């Protein structure tokens, strides 16, 4: 099987566009043309209004060129991800393929096309808004919903039941529990038959979540470098 397939490789190599720039493409286009800020873009209004209009139009044109044949740019993200993950799962079926959910750092998301509109500038992205902390966050909900849609297609529509999932960079039991709840709502939880693993960033989550009925964390893995950086609050981008 595959010990660890990382979704971020598909995001950077095959997609290359910030997921929210795709999810909100139509709303961004309306803003660029008419100055109208849709409710979904309200959290980003200050950044949008500080953006040079010509640069924003150029950015949206680049997104359109990267998604030829798509009238719904959101579907481009889902297609790239489901075919990328599906290809790996199909190649190794029935052997298990462990897929780690997206774990780009904020500076890496900013490097994607449109990323500067949606990502904060963080002093230490290595231990900041990443991994599990994003998935249940309202500011990333639309992006993670697309990720889940693609993975659900792989498991349900493609019938690749060797798919397994890993939650990366989980810092607290509450964080892990919230992510499990989101995955379950999206049809990707342990109750739907998908093995779920935990990559913890501190010593707390695995021990406490493992003993909770219904949470369904199957296994845990320490990211040793990340654990050290988190505990020491050490700087670093890699």
For the regions a language model picked out, list residue spans one by one:
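Conserved alpha/beta-domain cores
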Residues: 1-238
